Design a protein with these regions (language model features):
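Positively charged, low-complexity intrinsically disordered leader regions
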Residues: 1-22
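Conserved phosphate-binding/catalytic loop of the ribokinase/pfkB sugar-kinase fold
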Residues: 56, 81-83, 93-130
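Short, glycine/polar-rich helix-capping loops at beta-to-alpha or helix-loop-helix junctions
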Residues: 161-168
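Conserved small/polar residues in nucleotide/adenosyl-binding loops
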Residues: 192-193
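Substrate-binding N-lobe of the ribokinase-like
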Residues: 2-3, 23-90
């Protein structure tokens, strides 16, 4: 099975803090680190390292060459990456003294995945293949429907929770990946819409 990960690519800025910043508060960071990430990138690398045949489809900006390079260094095929003029996605991550985090994500180029991009990418995949998605990109609902129309299996990581999440055709998803917060939110949406 080939895996097409239509996934996010982010530049992560991680700040260690004693406590999460509150409204109208300024705190000093105890540590700063910069990483290449995004749920999509992380999942593609993990799958490739586990022996999977992984194609990463997504979008990067002019600042995203290091994202492409990291994927390729880890055996991920990047032929479906779209170069845009928009800055690559990025995240600001606070990690408190007990190791919990709060994350703000700017989609950047991740928001430039268009239906025609999805159709072009998926035209190379079929019934024996898996589409992996995260909710950090645009047109997730379209991608789910397009993949199922091609007979593909679909795995969806429902993070982050967004207002449109409850409108997605979750019934078409074969594998749903959630943490506690996302699971509770999704269950709440399903309870209110059924």
């Amino acid at each position: 099975m080939r895996i097409c990960n239509l996934g996010s690519l982010n530049i992560d800025r991680v700040y260690g803090v004693e406590h999460f910043v509150s409204a109208q508060e300024t705190v000093l960071a105890t540590k700063y680190e910069r990483f290449l990430g995004g749920k999509g990138l992380n999942q593609s690398i993990a799958l490739a390292r586990s022996g999977g045949t992984v194609f990463h489809a997504g979008a990067i900006g002019p600042d995203g060459m290091s994202l492409r390079q990291l994927l390729e260094e880890n055996g991920v095929d990047t032929r479906y990456l779209k170069d845009t003029h928009t800055a690559s996605g990025h995240a600001i991550i606070q990690v408190n003294a007990s190791g919990q985090n709060c994350i703000i994500v700017s989609r950047g180029a991740n928001a430039e995945i268009l239906p025609e991009d999805i159709d072009r990418i998926l035209s190379d995949f079929g019934q024996a293949d898996l589409l992996l998605l995260q909710n950090e990109i645009s047109n997730v609902d379209y991608a789910i429907q397009a993949a199922k129309a091609r007979g593909m299996s679909v795995a969806f990581n429902a993070a982050p929770v967004t207002p449109e999440l409850h409108t997605y055709p979750i019934d078409l998803v074969d594998y749903l990946i959630v943490n506690e917060v996302e699971g509770l939110s999704l269950l709440g949406c399903l309870l209110y819409t059924s």
